UniProtKB/Swiss-Prot annotation:
SUPFAM superfamilies from the UniProt entry: Ribosomal protein S5 domain 2-like
Organism of derivation: Gloeobacter violaceus (strain ATCC 29082 / PCC 7421)
UniProt-listed InterPro entries: IGPD_sf, ImidazoleglycerolP_deHydtase, ImidazoleglycerP_deHydtase_CS, Ribosomal_Su5_D2-typ_SF
GO terms, biological process: L-histidine biosynthetic process
Protein's pathway: Amino-acid biosynthesis; L-histidine biosynthesis; L-histidine from 5-phospho-alpha-D-ribose 1-diphosphate: step 6/9
Family named by the database record: Belongs to the imidazoleglycerol-phosphate dehydratase family.
Name the UniProt record assigns to this protein: Imidazoleglycerol-phosphate dehydratase
Enzyme Commission no: 4.2.1.19
Length: 197
């Protein structure tokens, strides 16, 4: 099997992002985005998705975290799509429910080629530390749009904002891990009755 490794560079007037993903990694992460909470969430994707992630970002943080947060999501989605290639042999679907203390979040995703986000998180506070919790949705939307995945997030329990967000990233990581895994029974075929994704 060819290595499923990809790199993406995204440079705008607002941000400069470099990212590298290895879908068959060991969970190694080096995240330096300038947004500590985002780095912490990227570490969840790496650790629980067994995806090696190297990301560095310089952004207009003197304004706020929005552009950096969104552009890291864009670059992650583009890099994921590139690493998946033609998607031959992948399982395609992934589902996981992750608890974190009182919080429980379920993620269901499909690497379908059709971008759609159904976002069901109810985060009770506007900030976790200095991180604006509205940016969680912005990150997921950017990933969805640029990887062309269908992503459903459902919160079944939770009152602590940090726990809810982190549970969502852990569930996303495990669901993504299932979806990108190679299914040996497919023998390299596309997981679609249409013959295209």
């Amino acid at each position: 099997m060819e290595p499923r490794i990809a790199s993406t560079v995204r440079t705008t007037r607002e941000t400069d992002i470099q990212i590298r993903l290895d879908l068959d990694g060991t969970g190694r992460v080096q995240a330096e985005t300038g947004v500590p909470f985002l780095d912490h969430m990227l570490a969840q994707i790496a650790t629980h998705g067994l995806i090696d992630i190297d990301v560095s970002a310089q952004g207009d943080l003197h304004i706020d975290d929005h552009h950096t947060n969104e552009d890291v999501g864009i670059a992650f989605g583009q890099c994921l799509a590139k690493a998946l290639g033609d998607k031959r042999g992948i399982s395609r679907f992934g589902h996981f429910a992750a608890p974190l203390d009182e919080a429980l979040v379920q993620v269901v995703l499909d690497l379908s080629g059709r971008p759609h986000l159904s976002y069901g998180l109810e985060i009770p506070t506007q900030r976790v530390g200095s991180y604006d919790t509205q940016l969680v949705r912005e990150f997921y939307q950017a990933v969805v749009n640029n990887s062309s995945m269908t992503l459903h997030l459902r919160q079944w329990a939770g009152i602590n904002s940090h726990h809810i967000i982190e549970a969502s990233f852990k569930a996303f990581a495990r669901a993504l891990r299932l979806a990108v895994e190679i299914d040996p029974r497919r023998a390299g075929s596309l997981p679609s009755s249409k013959g295209a994704l």
